[in-house]
Amino acid sequence: MSGIMVVIEQREGRIARISWEAVAAGQSLASQFGLPVNAILVGSDLEFLAAEVAARGLAKVIRVEHPLLAYYTADGFKLALEQLIQTEQPAYVVFPHTYQVRDYAPALAARLGQVLIGDVVAIGEGPLFTRQLLQGRLNGNYRHAGNGPCFVSVQAGAFRAETTQTGASEVTGFTPTIDAAQIRTKPSEPFRGRSQTVDLGSAQLIVSIGRGIKDAENIPIVQELAKALGAELAASRPICDNGWLPMDRQVGSSGQTVSPKLYLAIGISGAIQHLVGMKGSQCIVAINKDPDAPIFEVADYGIVGDLFEVVPALIAALESQKG
């Protein structure tokens, strides 16, 4: 067995950021063993997407195509990937940890006599796979034992999409054998929820507010800071639940997952539900008057103080720098 296979999730011709994060995880894993990394696209008419993926410095990109894979079904994806894995014999199979992957990947691993190590947040030497337990209060380390490929899914924000390598990749095709009778579910048209007007996942600078803001009428103070920084404004769940900011501004387990260059957390205590959505940020700065607030445990820099004093001082400092 050799090589690392990264399954790229695409929907309606678009590749989600978490798929690039999975590629970064696969390339990080490959650096330990000098193994080639192959990206896998599943669907139909994948030529355009394959060209996009092929620019990421991979050994090859494999287009797994069949008319019955045009729309996602758990049966179709399991059958197609099982045949590909049996043909390619990879040592590791890496997935982005998405709802779709959770639907089919555990069963795929079981069909091949394996288990899925899900929601991995770090990969250490060995390799050692780390995932969070008890709502993030503990870390558990896992190793793969036995023969057969190791199946892993990586948590959103745990690996940086921008660290993927660059360079041309070979593109090949694979046609699985699938019969319509093997597909036990009938795909419907993709669900289209309310359009999300704010893509916090692509923001490089984020200013986020929590309960410490006290009242909706105080939000303009932080909005002014965000404007001075050229940052997107975000919030923890209580702010959005109260209707003080739209739901598409929410960061956390029930909101968006972000990994900006700077995440400025203002008046946020640091509940685990919020931390899982922003802990992948490159630099976290926290402002909170409670010195024991959990947010300081993940912050790179912390200011213990009243936000209503600190934020105006920051705005004044930024304005003075602009001259």
Predicted feature locations:
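N-terminal glycine-rich FAD/FM-binding segment characteristic of electron-transfer flavoproteins
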Residues: M1-G323
